[in-house]
Amino acid sequence: MKHILHIICLAFCLTAMAAYGTEGKKPSATARQMERAGYVIIQKADPTIHVSLMYARADNFTGRVLYTDLREAYLHPKAAAALVKAQKRLKQLRPDLSLKVYDAARPMHIQQTMWNVVRGTKKDIYVSNPAHGGGMHNYGLAVDITLCNAKGDTLDMGTKIDYLGTAAHINQEDVLVRQHRISKQA
């Protein structure tokens, strides 16, 4: 009888843990730093926005995982409100599409790691130097986004996310279309 009671208790605990998912987990050191700075979690501001942090994976321009303990995307409250507004507008125009966040607020020590990768190369124009205060990502005021379908599959934007080259320059769009380096649809 004791064994059955233990099994029932264990099953209850496992079910409760599965039901709560990661909500019961203690925030990481980086997450606590973001929260102390007053940043908000994008997924809580609007759960319909997809998030796939590119620096939590190795398939980025550095070739390594930079966000070792960060899984949530954070933004300054005003930037988060603007992103939520953009998502609502997108849903009005195209209910089948959604915004997908690849990067948002970024700790300065991560910025330093990125800078170390590009320092002294032709690509250093794409990464803010932390010695000069970093960039808008470091203050929760920049967000790297794309569009995705309901399954989270991204739409073709002409270049891969995190592409460090002229095809990604927004001020060169017309020239790049004429040169067939990007499409008009992108």
Task: Write out the residue ranges for each language-model feature.
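Bacterial Sec-dependent N-terminal signal peptides
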Residues: 1-25
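Extracytoplasmic cell-surface/polysaccharide-interacting catalytic and binding patches
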Residues: 20-104, 114-117, 121-186
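Segments that shape or occlude catalytic/ligand-binding pockets
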Residues: 107
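Short, well-ordered surface patches within globular domains
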Residues: 110
